């Protein structure tokens, strides 16, 4: 281990930590040798209505994949996040809300949040929402989004939060897949000083005849902007609350009853409805939040994610609130009104823990030290990174410039499907290496396998798999268990395949090398190449499209699209712009292509399979590293693409 790249645990951190090195080793050992005993003990941190007797019933056998934790116990998630804190922490701030406009902020106590959640839970019941019904939440980053999630959990409804940046078409697809009964939205969203037409997007989504399961649309007033109104379907959020009782008994839920669906991009195009259940998910979110962030009562914790992504679910809402923490909810973006926004929020609210994405870090880093000019930052004691691997340069900048060399960085690796953090340093236990996610969390058994599924020992690189279940693991894909099995358990039998590659160094530290399937990681958000390709070929002028990821200074991965036009169509800059706007409309701004290269043909095998490996190499100008092209039906296509790429780069 080279001393230059190693950041040992700081003595002052080790002295006050919840988990030092000896504790980590002892707890990790117990968690993998005796998972039943370990998780039985950890589950006592939750309040149960009916205690469980059986801890773990799990099988990764691809003929009968079945994952159950604490299956005969009952509890309620909202009770665990709210009610049980009222006696001792009722007047503690649960949510600090920071608006897009720096002049707007609110503080909401646990008692106030509990009252509003109960009112809205009663309002949902009044709209015929009951246990097992699906509610779609398409909201800006405002407290009402959290209220809606917890209100669903309180009455046993299943929430499906859809990121407010998704287009009406993408929203409709997600509503149709889960037969959503109610949609909760806002008149408009505010982000970076711009308004987003959320209610108008819902209206457009619901013109799709297949969305007929939706009975009501509940609208929260955010901007007061003018919107269309369907008096038979639309209801104001605030008018419902005005007449609702603040008393609502939490529904007794089985440990394995569904809590939420969250759609994530798949390599086959159609988004996957990742299904999480009640007890195991909540326990895992709470325990990882406490131990990874070394959270202590009274601290101000800020995760910059959106609740439309799993990071927002686990580490803005459920993990922090289950722990009685103060969680900061930010409506805006890191560079509005200017690049100092993050630093100003840290100082304004005396933030102790900052959990953000490499995309935001790179955006601040691009401005040098401007982002911290005039900032104090002395409240910070811990930094976190999530969404994609952080390159060592960005890690160093984050550590030196934002953390002033005083704050450990927890570089966390996990997925929508994992429910919570799987590989991460613990600040009081783990010596840090910039760019490494380091070591597994309790109960997590990672391994590397070659392409045939053979385990690789020692320092090596391979496909990252997990050998046994953990409580936060997704149980299925909504309405499609076969796809769940095919996606995660068929590639390497008896193991959970993450879809990521990794290397393990001589100290047993893991370094995530990125996706090995056709899924891109754009600004920490997963985008399926097939989803973007499908949107592109839906354009009347496009015959064929192939999407690959390329390195991007700000986003981590950029979207590079090769486009073959229909006969008679001519390439032009105007058409490039038209295609970019088309994809934005079909999927959302997040999927907007960074590069479009015209291609008279694509490199295909004789069976018709597009050789994306070759397209990736051309997109990154690695012309001499194309590998074997003898299997191509028309090898001449490759040289044409290389020539075009060189011309584009020279332009």
From Swiss-Prot:
Native species: Pseudomonas savastanoi pv. phaseolicola (strain 1448A / Race 6) (Pseudomonas syringae pv. phaseolicola (strain 1448A / Race 6))
GO molecular function: acetate-CoA ligase activity; AMP binding; ATP binding; metal ion binding
Cited function: Catalyzes the conversion of acetate into acetyl-CoA (AcCoA), an essential intermediate at the junction of anabolic and catabolic pathways. AcsA undergoes a two-step reaction. In the first half reaction, AcsA combines acetate with ATP to form acetyl-adenylate (AcAMP) intermediate. In the second half reaction, it can then transfer the acetyl group from AcAMP to the sulfhydryl group of CoA, forming the product AcCoA.
Keywords: Acetylation, ATP-binding, Ligase, Magnesium, Metal-binding, Nucleotide-binding
Modification after translation: Acetylated. Deacetylation by the SIR2-homolog deacetylase activates the enzyme.
Binding site for ATP: 387-389, 411-416, 500, 515, 526
Lineage of source species: Bacteria, Pseudomonadati, Pseudomonadota, Gammaproteobacteria, Pseudomonadales
Any one of the GO BP annotations: acetyl-CoA biosynthetic process from acetate
NCBIfam families xrefs: Ac_CoA_lig_AcsA, PRK00174.1
PROSITE patterns in the cross-refs: AMP_BINDING (PS00455)
Binding positions (CoA): 191-194, 311, 335, 523, 584
CC annotations in GO: cytosol
PANTHER family linked: ACETYL-COENZYME A SYNTHETASE
Family to which this protein belongs: Belongs to the ATP-dependent AMP-binding enzyme family.
Catalytic reaction equation(s): acetate + ATP + CoA = acetyl-CoA + AMP + diphosphate
Modification type N6-acetyllysine: residues: 609
Gene3D superfamilies in UniProt: 3.30.300.30, N-terminal domain of ligase-like
HAMAP family for this protein: Ac_CoA_synth
EC identifiers of the protein: 6.2.1.1
Residues reported to bind Mg(2+): 537, 539, 542
Name of the molecule in the record: Acetyl-coenzyme A synthetase
